[in-house]
């Protein structure tokens, strides 16, 4: 008796929902007949005669599926053949935002023309961009994605040169949605001047003038602020606002009075009297009268103890040069209507707008701070900041008004900023970097949650040393920081463009990963780049599946590289795909930060 010998080669290529067929063949050296059986296989695979039939499902695609077939000869001999098949599959991207409004959570599908894509590394070193299609409102499919990791590229408009925002993932489902405050804001065809006449009473007759503000629940609308006279309880004033935002979209607004309170080096504005205006019917391009009586706010308090020494230790080994701490920020704010999650800014919303703070730094401008607290993006600094806190300090108890519904999310934000010198030619410029966190005011431990990455390198060279690399496909490596485990890291890539009196930083791409290394999509030979690596901590965010869904606590920390030049003449890998979409990688036109000698 001799064992049969397989003469067929397994078929290893397959695709989701497509028929897979493999015809088994074997010979019996003894001259007998051979029959076949299927010992192990994915669910749904069948053997008819000598042919294996299978239609990979979504759950079976993009993962390895094991097969074992057995050949048995008529004389009793047997042999087995084993192989694996990883079918290409469909990646499903859900882009449905949750907008929290006075009437509840509203599901808003992402822009239908902003179709995501997948940039897939190939075995030969090339990269292929696979375009997605819209399956239904807020749902997109990217077909024929092989198993393993790929870059999920967030969509923009067709042919847009905006730089890529990418996530390194192996997931077959991906959620690009986010939670945000307020209904969507409509746009007018052209800017219009809208007048507001305010007739208010119920102010706290403070001897130290604070700020009275009209703040909407739609973040893109900037607050309207006034400084009342000392000792008065009423305010009559007018304001003209020129804007393309349609005021008819504003349902709710808050009339608030902020009053200055200092705790040692923390100079705060805290919420005093307040009035919520609901079911507004505002009209753009005309005069709107706003009248009402503010009422005293119920009091809340927070004990502030800040371990400044732990923050100071963050600022070591984060940039090529020595950093200089420049300021700190502390705020407490509700997230209107938001329950159980943490809101993110609306997609494509401007960086400045309305935010209803209950505590914020005192503003020397006499205006409320028109922006989000503690931006993690590089180079943004809060407009109004307190001195940096570098030693452990107990500031005592801070009282503030909190008149808002108890089920709304409340967020305490604390961050510190530093600057580091950046040299272009013979000129040196300060570059700002931020470090921050958000927690619940009910348990405000203000020790930093996120630490900067450790020992970052590019192609094996120290990232803090000016260098040239001989590859357009740069590989970044770093070690994870101590402390709370991050859910991932984001690398901001900037092209450095010298100008006669300064330089520009052109955003060339934003790439995120849950790992401690990253092979970037191709850069351009001859260009000089700057890399900023952000460590990110979040209660629920998942960098490989749902990076924008958030829950407290959150934290971030920053590292900035030296200048890295891609050697001129360096050949890059082949890029395949729609030329219009590849433009985002080859010739990106992102936001430009222009820094000149007159604006240090």
Model region roles, listed by residue range:
Residues 6-53, 81-87:
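Surface-exposed or secretory-pathway low-complexity segments enriched in glycine-proline
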Residues 25-30, 73, 480-485:
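Extracellular acidic, Ser/Thr/Pro-rich low-complexity tracts
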Residues 54, 468-485:
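Conserved aromatic anchor
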């Amino acid at each position: 008796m001799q064992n049969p010998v397989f003469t067929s080669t397994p078929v290893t290529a397959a695709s989701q929902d497509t028929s897979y067929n493999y015809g088994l063949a074997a010979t019996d050296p003894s001259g007998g007949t051979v029959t076949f059986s299927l010992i192990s296989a994915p669910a749904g695979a069948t053997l008819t005669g000598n042919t294996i039939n299978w239609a990979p499902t979504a759950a079976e695609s993009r993962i390895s599926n094991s097969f074992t077939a057995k050949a048995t000869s008529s004389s009793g001999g047997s042999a087995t053949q084993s192989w694996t098949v990883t079918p290409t599959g469909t990646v499903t991207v859900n882009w449905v935002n949750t907008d929290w409004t006075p009437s509840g959570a509203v599901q808003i599908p992402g822009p239908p023309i902003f179709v995501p894509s997948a940039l897939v590394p190939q075995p030969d070193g090339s990269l292929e961009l696979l375009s997605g299609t819209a399956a239904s409102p807020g749902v997109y499919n990217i077909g024929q994605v092989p198993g393993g990791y790929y870059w999920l590229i967030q969509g923009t408009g067709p042919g847009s040169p905006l730089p890529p925002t990418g996530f390194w993932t192996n997931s077959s489902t991906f959620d690009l949605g986010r939670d945000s405050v307020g209904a969507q804001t409509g746009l007018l065809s052209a800017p219009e001047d809208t007048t507001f006449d305010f007739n208010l009473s119920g102010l706290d007759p403070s001897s130290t003038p604070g700020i009275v503000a009209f703040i909407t629940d739609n973040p893109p609308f900037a607050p309207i602020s006034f400084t009342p006279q000392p000792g008065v309880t009423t305010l009559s004033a007018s304001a003209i606002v020129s804007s393309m935002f349609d005021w008819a979209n504003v349902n709710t607004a808050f009339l608030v009075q902020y009053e200055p309170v200092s705790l040692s080096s923390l100079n705060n504005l805290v919420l005093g009297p307040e009035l919520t205006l609901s079911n507004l019917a505002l009209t753009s391009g005309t005069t709107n009268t706003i009248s009402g009586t503010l009422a005293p706010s119920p009091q809340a308090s927070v004990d502030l103890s800040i371990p400044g020494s732990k923050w100071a230790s963050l600022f070591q080994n984060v940039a090529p040069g020595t950093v200089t701490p420049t300021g700190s920020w502390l705020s407490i704010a509700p997230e209107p209507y938001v329950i159980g999650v943490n809101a993110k800014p609306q997609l494509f919303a401007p960086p400045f707008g309305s935010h209803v703070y209950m505590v914020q730094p005192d503003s020397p401008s006499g205006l409320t701070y028109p922006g989000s607290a503690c931006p993690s993006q590089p180079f943004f600094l809060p407009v109004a900041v307190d001195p940096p806190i570098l030693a452990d300090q107990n500031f005592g108890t801070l009282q503030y008004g909190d008149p808002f519904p108890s089920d709304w999310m409340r967020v305490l934000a604390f961050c510190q900023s530093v600057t580091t010198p950046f040299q272009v030619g013979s000129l040196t410029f300060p570059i700002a970097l931020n470090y921050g966190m958000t927690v619940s005011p009910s348990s405000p431990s203000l020790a930093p949650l996120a630490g900067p990455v450790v020992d970052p390198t590019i192609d094996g060279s120290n990232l803090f040393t000016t260098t040239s690399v001989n590859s357009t496909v740069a590989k970044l490596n770093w070690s994870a920081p101590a402390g709370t485990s991050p859910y991932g890291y984001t690398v901001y890539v900037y092209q450095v463009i010298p100008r006669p009196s300064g330089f520009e930083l052109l955003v060339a791409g934003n790439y995120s990963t849950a790992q401690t290394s990253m092979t970037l999509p191709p850069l351009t030979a001859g260009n000089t780049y700057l890399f900023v690596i952000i460590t990110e901590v979040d209660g629920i965010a998942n960098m490989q599946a749902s990076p924008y869904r958030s829950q407290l606590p959150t934290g971030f920390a920053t590292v900035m590289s030296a200048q890295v030049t891609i050697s001129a003449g360096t050949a890059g890998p082949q890029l395949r795909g729609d030329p219009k979409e590849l433009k985002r990688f080859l010739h990106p036109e992102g936001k430009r930060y222009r820094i000149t000698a007159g604006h240090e």
